[in-house]
Amino acid sequence: MKKPSAATEKALKRRLVEASWILAMEGQGDLVWGHASVRAPGQDTFWIKPTGLGLDEIRVEDLLLCDLEGRVVRGTKPRHIEVYIHSEVMRARPDVCAVVHTHALHPTVFASLGVPLAPVTHEATVFVPPDIPRFDETTDLINSPER
């Protein structure tokens, strides 16, 4: 598989940082939790923020390049423990080039109720039937591919 050009890689990293800032600005941040990732089409590696930084704090030079096993390929900062959310989605779906995981206040509160969520907007009806999806298999960190 052909490696992306330096210009493509630079643009992807810049867009990831900007997307993270927008997520933070829109209330998606939760201290240092929450992360987004991006990869060039057809690649087995992706860019993600390191642990210890909020969505609003990251800069291009902070980003890590990880492989689908969750190993850091490029970068020196510690990898986020939930890297497997991104690697497993990208492994299962080669067509997916970006993954976002956040802890927005209102969706988190509603998801914690443990009841089906009713679609109250036209956009939400895309998910019905059967229900607006939510992950409820664990409340722990996703710290391995098996989780």
Regions picked out by a protein language model, each given a short descriptive name:
Residues M1-R147:
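Glycine-rich flexible loops
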